Amino acid sequence: DSDEFLEMSQIPRSLIVVGAGVIGVEYATMFSALDVKVTLIEPRKTFLDFIDRTLIQEFTHQIRENGVDLRLGSAVANIEDKGDHVQLELENGRQVQAEMLLFAAGRIGATEKLGMEAVGLELDHRGRFSVDRKTYQTDVPNIYAAGDVIGHPSLASTSLQQGRVAACHALNT
């Protein structure tokens, strides 16, 4: 996973990154700069949707120019460990292989066992809360949510700030 990925003892010759979110793109560009052959796979047809489309178009051009094989709209159907490499089969039938695989398709908050229906809160299909983005208050007064349980961007720094805003609002400060 992305937390332990940098502890590897040697740099791979090739890398597949599944997930073109902030973390996946960061690792893909970092390893590409180290002359690693990188394939970045994203099941959606777009990526980093919270960034201006014009900037993303230019960024897409630059990372491809730097050697990243960007595969948008490509979902993974199967993963096989072949010993000296990993082989992925995509839903379109194409195969991709590399020495190493990084799964960076995001984190999901552990909300399924919270029993939120008991207080009248519903979660979306990914187990996320709907909140007021100015206060991080849910539809139920006095219940707030921040970080991975509300969706993108799921970054520690962003989550920390969301938590601060929610706490200030909850305490009326």
Give the positions of each predicted feature.
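FAD-site-proximal beta/loop scaffold in flavoenzymes
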Residues: 1-11, 95-169
